[in-house]
């Protein structure tokens, strides 16, 4: 699989995070290496770039792209291992960290990865092929109550219970093994009137299953907790999100770093020990321009938030 990936908010992210050409920067979501390539173009010979990706194909692509560049360190690992990996590489602290939380276009477009509801393929959705839990396992073996909660919580799918009822009935007859089979089940479950409105009827269900299979939100929370420890004072973290669940986690985490007092108003003196660890570089998230959205419709829902360690 070749990575032909259109990077979102490229200049805005790199301009906001990379400020010291001799610094060490971490791309936690290497993907097609679009952000990493631009970061490298901004670094001097003393600068360093660390790229994380749990997909071995992304690592292979980056090895080919950056072959022979001594500034580049590639880690075939989920970014949940950020702090441990940087310690083992003896690269702490770092001057910047960036995350692009969108599924890379090759993963969406290559049918065999099983992420897309637009192409029929094996029902998979694993970012890391070594992950024992696939979407096929989850759909065929997950309890109905758990599946309904996943679709509602991670996909905000209002037809979650009805979709799961149809899934349970279908899997009684035979295992659901392909994306096409699952799409057909979802279409049968959602009333015709509702299917004609809004996005593709399978979009929310596929998003929810992908998040659950890869524990995306849990991994993000744990990684952000590490980021603030990994950054040098003045270092920045930039995070691009693509849906409200991710953005809420980033917003709440950044706000928790501001050190605002949480004591009741009746307390004359702060007792909670609040201490500011970071500041927001921009009060509101940065959004793609109309021109970028026109050129790359997948950018439409992107939001960029940047924080700076004090």
Curated annotation (Swiss-Prot):
S-adenosyl-L-methionine binds at residues 33-35, 53, 79, 100, 107. GO terms for molecular function: rRNA (cytosine-N4-)-methyltransferase activity. Transmembrane segments: none annotated. Its EC number is 2.1.1.199. GO terms for cellular component: cytoplasm. Its main location: cytoplasm. The keyword rRNA processing applies. InterPro entries: RsmH, SAM-dep_MeTrfase_MraW_recog, SAM-dependent_MTases_sf. It catalyses: cytidine(1402) in 16S rRNA + S-adenosyl-L-methionine = N(4)-methylcytidine(1402) in 16S rRNA + S-adenosyl-L-homocysteine + H(+). It is found in: Cytoplasm. Pfam families: Methyltransf_5. One of its GO terms (biological process) is rRNA base methylation. Keywords: Cytoplasm, Methyltransferase, rRNA processing, S-adenosyl-L-methionine, Transferase. HAMAP family: 16SrRNA_methyltr_H. Belongs to the methyltransferase superfamily. RsmH family. Specifically methylates the N4 position of cytidine in position 1402 (C1402) of 16S rRNA. This is Ribosomal RNA small subunit methyltransferase H. It comes from Desulfitobacterium hafniense (strain Y51).
């Amino acid at each position: 699989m070749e990575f032909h990936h259109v990077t979102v908010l490229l200049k805005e992210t790199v301009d906001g995070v990379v400020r010291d050409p001799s610094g060490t920067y971490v791309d936690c979501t290497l993907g097609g290496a679009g952000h990493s390539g631009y970061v490298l173009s901004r670094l001097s010979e003393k600068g360093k770039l660390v790229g994380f990706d749990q997909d071995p194909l992304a690592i292979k692509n980056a090895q080919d792209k950056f072959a022979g560049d001594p500034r580049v360190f590639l880690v075939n690992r989920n970014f949940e291992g950020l702090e441990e990996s940087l310690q083992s590489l003896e690269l702490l602290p770092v001057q910047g960290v960036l995350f692009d939380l969108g599924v890379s276009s090759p993963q969406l477009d290559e049918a065999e990865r099983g992420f897309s509801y637009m192409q029929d393929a094996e029902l998979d959705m694993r970012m890391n092929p070594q992950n024992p839990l696939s979407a096929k396992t989850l759909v065929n073996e997950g309890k109905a109550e758990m599946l309904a909660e996943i679709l509602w919580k991670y996909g905000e799918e209002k037809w979650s219970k009805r979709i799961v009822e149809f899934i349970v009935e279908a899997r009684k007859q035979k295992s659901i093994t392909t994306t096409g089979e699952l799409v057909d089940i979802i279409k049968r479950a959602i009333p015709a009137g509702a299917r004609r409105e809004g996005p593709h009827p399978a979009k929310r269900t596929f998003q929810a299953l992908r998040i659950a299979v890869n524990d995306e939100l849990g991994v993000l929370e744990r990684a952000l907790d590490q980021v603030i420890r990994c950054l040098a004072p003045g270092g920045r973290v930039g995070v691009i999100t693509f849906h409200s669940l991710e953005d809420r986690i980033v917003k709440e985490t950044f706000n928790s770093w501001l050190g605002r007092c949480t004591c009741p108003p009746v307390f004359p003196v702060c007792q909670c020990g609040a201490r500011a660890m970071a500041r927001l570089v921009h009060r509101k998230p940065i959004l793609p321009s109309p021109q970028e959205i026109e050129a790359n419709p997948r950018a439409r829902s992107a939001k960029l938030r940047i924080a700076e360690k004090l």
